[in-house]
Amino acid sequence: MFVQAPPTPNYKWFSCISSTVFTALCLLPIFSAAGYAQTPQNRVIKIGVVQRFGTKATDKLTLKAIPGDSLTLSYKTPQGTETKTVASIKLEIANKPLEAPLVEERVVLSSHRSFESAEDSANQWRAKGIDVEIAQPLRWQVWAKRDTYNSPLVRRWLLQSLQAQGNKTAFLDTKVFKQIPQTFWVLNGFRFNRNELDVTAGKNVIEVLEQTTQEATAIEPEKAIQETRRYGGSLRLQKNAYGTYTLVNEVPTETYLRGVVPHEIGAFSPYASIVAQTILARTYALRNLRRFAVDNYELCADVNCQVYKGLAEVYPQSDRAIAQTSGLVLTYENQLVDALYSASSGGVTARFGDVWHGPERPYLRSIVDSPNNVWDLSKQSLSDENNFRRFMTLKKGFNEEKEETFRWREEVSLTSIGGFLKQYLQKKKHPLANFKTVTQVEVVERSPAGRVLQMKVQTDLGPIDIDKDEIRNAFYPPISTLFYLEPIYNADKTLNGYAFVGGGFGHGVGMSQTGSYNLANLGWNGSRILGFYFPGAQVVPLGDAITFWRE
């Protein structure tokens, strides 16, 4: 199935780059007090800015108008839709006792670190005739579609059928609730209990104060968090697939980019890098609108999508890049590219298939991240362990050579490896999750670009294989999959642990953000930078002939 852009109106597209007058016009705010109009080039997108409101009974959200403005609340009553005008509103949570326990149950077919691999898994299940949906309760998961498998009998029949065919990863996730979170607010002495609320502002800017509690981790205790953001567009509070609430920001794409670009690439980065990042961020957003269909919104506001901080911190350089590239996207054969980027590549970018499961993208190739001829991958494949280790000794001639994460080393004991791996396997409900000891870890296979494709862990219960980007979830040290292992021995020559010796930060597919800095400083413009990291792709104005993605 092809998902295409809406029809393009008949108008002249122009660049804001050269004309002083046009530049001044383009740098005006992207929203105004008069409101905003959705166009094919500036469609309104739905961002889950607070994804799990109500997880804690102490969660609070305060929505405020900016000075000189007011908020309009819209909500359902038995008599129809009612509206109220206020300066601010405080949303709180009360745990509502249930007359009878509520059982929520789903068949989880697979669990993944990333949406990309989850989507490939979903497509494989669909090819087998199983109706599925993608969700993200914590990790990304593929569920048997709840509307289709809507009874305990049908769900158990499906699970038993899969197990009879040898499937060991699918499981039944069952939760029993004696109470559920209910959002409420108090207005003029009356308490309103509602599951949906729409909030607009005359000037299309709403301030959000979020108060919540961050759960304790292995290295940090539980702590209270208070954060204030400003969002353009409107807000909607709605139920999600997990029994809590999501605050959704409905915002024009170009306004959304103001809260993304400076926080992804850095507000004071070289300007050509900011331009390249802007085109990628726009392309990424439009290509990934399907990510949260299960929750009835489109994108999140963190690193599982793109970091989005609203309008509280916007900067002239990124605003200028957004205005000057208005409507420009990166395409390959009239389809939006998978506009991937990471902090640093470690000197060589990865193919899509080096990191995730799914079809290769022809424009996402393994490229030595250097303007110079420092290594020839066609003659010295990094799948060869000796070549790879020699490559990792190189420190000069690369775009990222001055970056701290270009090369790194982290030592970890077998005990720590085992503890971290056990947590990972328990979340996946892996059959060997209750192992007691790890005796050996090894790299089994790596790609021609040097990325680790598979690792094997020997435990007292048997071997466990970890592949591709799951490696970064299963082990604590590696911040990329571009690494090798060095054993560390005790004084008595028994194995104590391993040093992970590697390079880069992130998945390494597509554009290296720090690599783009060097290319920009060499005088490359944004389009040339994108051409380097996405060979064969083209920067074009968004139009109705462009396919957003293929399902």
Across the structure, where does each feature detected by a protein language model lie?
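Conserved, single-site charged/polar hotspot
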Residues: 2-6, 10-551
